[in-house]
Amino acid sequence: MSTAQRRLPVYKKILEENKKKWMIKEFLEYRLAKYGYIDSEILKTPLGTRIVIYAERPSRIIGRKGAIVKEVSSILANKLGVENPQIDVIDVSKIEAPELFPKVVAYRIANAMARGVRFRRVMFVAVRQLMEAGAKGFEIVVSGKLSTERAKFEKITYGKLYKIGYDAKNRVRRAVVHVLLKPGIYGIEVRITPATLRYSDEYKIKPPTRPEAAAQ
């Protein structure tokens, strides 16, 4: 048996795990979006699968006497094959600088547009909040029928933001949200470089230190 053949089951396992995580996230967003769902983290533990849900309205996601969380846990276990799902719901407003979560920014823009606020005004508000939160870089793109019958897009970019390579895939946060308005469907894409992120090509040069005086 070749080395590639011996490694194949490992790769298959990784692909299956990533596929399952994607399915879980898709289901959670579909089921809980109207209750203020923002994002989620999926962590494997010795006791099963821990799912951390970030939400703007945690009480609505939990439901009366935990009814919604219990329903979601049952579907994850029985239909998606998630091993012993344990769900924690965290209020995103209690996290330091929630504006650095792209889903938070995208949903706020979408909700404001749904209320009739002009898209440019909402984008500039988001830009101010991101700069105040200390983002190293960001990009906000709103696409759809913005001013004419033809679809177009409006984009605001600031700071340092990678779009390709390792940093773009693993360190830059990205979210896409769609909202249905009277003229049609609009897309909001947000990419954020967090304030605490250190790029893989970023380094600091320490200032030279004076050698200690030679012993007399």
Swiss-Prot record:
Annotated KH type-2 domain residues: 24-93
Task: Provide an example Pfam family for this protein.
Answer: Ribosomal_S3_C
What the entry lists under Gene3D superfamilies is as follows: 3.30.300.20, Ribosomal protein S3, C-terminal domain
Keyword Iron assigned: no
Where is it found, in Gene Ontology cellular component terms? cytosolic small ribosomal subunit
What GO MF terms are annotated? rRNA binding; structural constituent of ribosome
The family note in this entry says: Belongs to the universal ribosomal protein uS3 family.
Q: What does this protein do?
A: Binds the lower part of the 30S subunit head.
**Name of the protein:** Small ribosomal subunit protein uS3
Q: Which organism is it from?
A: Pyrobaculum calidifontis (strain DSM 21063 / JCM 11548 / VA1)
Q: Which gene encodes it?
A: rps3
